[in-house]
């Protein structure tokens, strides 16, 4: 990255990401059918989600082939199991853009695994090996904690899983009657920048798109979460999401507004992202991307790919806005 543009002039290509200048302000969303909405019977805990971010960071940077990566992956899988979900790991060997051989691990946790009607929520759990967007060039080879970029999406999913367990155990709450999968992508954030660099990012989701964890897996749609835990964050209707899954985008953004989080979920079309949702969409599954943009700067969050992407810069209200919106979606 050589610099950032404001949101009115960016075309973001993220596989954790490249920003390219483009013209035009975010477009107002098209008028769409109103979504029926009933408030969810449960409350998403931003404190729990924050603690899950902190726990991931406590292992150290979750870079490929590292001990921290292995230990954190084991903890994520064990935590989903503790919340009563069926968990499996999808392993695969791959090479990074520089030829480094890596062992990937996509983690899939399933609520109501026997249900045929399913949706999924996803996010990547690895962290970037280099702080190559840090103002201090001497830190460009330093691995980052990935508290927001990676950790926040996984934390939201873990808290959603905990809430689903509460619903399943409570006689007075009608738990969702649909199967829900939480997919934790690996090897998203070790790509390189350049004109033909897109395929170097999102290796875990690229692999899964060709080798789904079950042969007959055909969810109604997916929702990918990326960088959903920093301050001054907003979410636009992302271009690829609108191309492949406009009804899902509409549903989520309307529910967010009805639940009181309209100031986070901006009712306008933003930039194009090449994130984990893209290989999923291209494989035939509608999937949307909820990815954070700094409200003031119109760029990725200011801690993006810097050593400051740590637990000190996680903002609980943003975790709450995204987490409660996802909970409302699951119960509606």
What are these regions (language model features)?
Residues 141-247, 272:
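Acidic/histidine-rich catalytic neighborhood of metal-dependent amide-processing enzymes
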Residues 51-114:
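A non-catalytic alpha/beta surface segment that caps or lines the substrate-entry region
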Residues 62-64, 94-95, 114-115, 125-129, ...:
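Solvent-exposed loop/turn segments at secondary-structure junctions
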Residues 18-21:
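C-terminal motif of bacterial Sec signal peptides marking the signal peptidase cleavage site
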Residues 2-11:
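Bacterial N-terminal signal peptides that target proteins for export
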């Amino acid at each position: 990255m050589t610099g950032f543009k404001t949101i009115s002039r960016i075309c973001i290509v993220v596989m954790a990401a490249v920003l390219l200048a483009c013209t035009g302000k975010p477009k107002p969303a098209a008028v769409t059918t109103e979504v029926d909405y009933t408030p969810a019977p449960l409350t998403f805990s931003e404190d729990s989600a924050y603690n899950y971010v902190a726990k991931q960071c406590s292992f150290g940077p979750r870079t490929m082939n590292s001990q921290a990566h292995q230990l954190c992956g084991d903890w994520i899988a064990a935590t989903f199991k503790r919340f009563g979900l069926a968990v499996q790991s999808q392993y695969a060997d791959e090479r990074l853009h520089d030829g480094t051989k890596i062992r990937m691990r996509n983690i899939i946790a399933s609520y109501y695994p026997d249900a045929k009607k399913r949706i999924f929520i996803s996010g990547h759990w690895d962290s970037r090996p280099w702080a190559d967007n840090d103002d201090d060039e001497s830190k460009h080879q330093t691995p980052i904690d990935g508290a927001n970029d990676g950790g926040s999406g996984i934390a939201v999913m873990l808290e959603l899983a905990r809430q689903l367990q509460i619903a399943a155990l409570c006689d007075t709450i009608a738990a969702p009657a649909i199967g829900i999968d939480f997919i934790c992508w690996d090897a998203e954030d070790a790509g390189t920048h350049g004109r033909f660099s897109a395929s170097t990012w999102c290796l875990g989701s690229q692999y899964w798109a060709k080798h789904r964890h079950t042969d007959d897996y055909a969810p109604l749609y997916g929702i990918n979460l990326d960088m959903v835990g920093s301050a001054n964050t907003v979410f636009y209707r992302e271009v690829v999401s609108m191309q492949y899954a406009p009804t899902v985008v509409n549903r989520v953004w309307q529910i967010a507004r009805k639940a009181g989080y309209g100031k986070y979920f901006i009712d306008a079309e933003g930039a194009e992202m090449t994130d984990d949702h893209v290989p999923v969409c291209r494989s035939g599954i509608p999937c949307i991307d909820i990815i954070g943009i700094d409200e003031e700067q119109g760029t990725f969050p200011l801690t993006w790919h810097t050593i400051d992407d740590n637990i000190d810069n996680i903002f609980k209200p943003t975790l709450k806005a995204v987490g409660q919106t996802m909970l409302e979606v699951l119960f509606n």
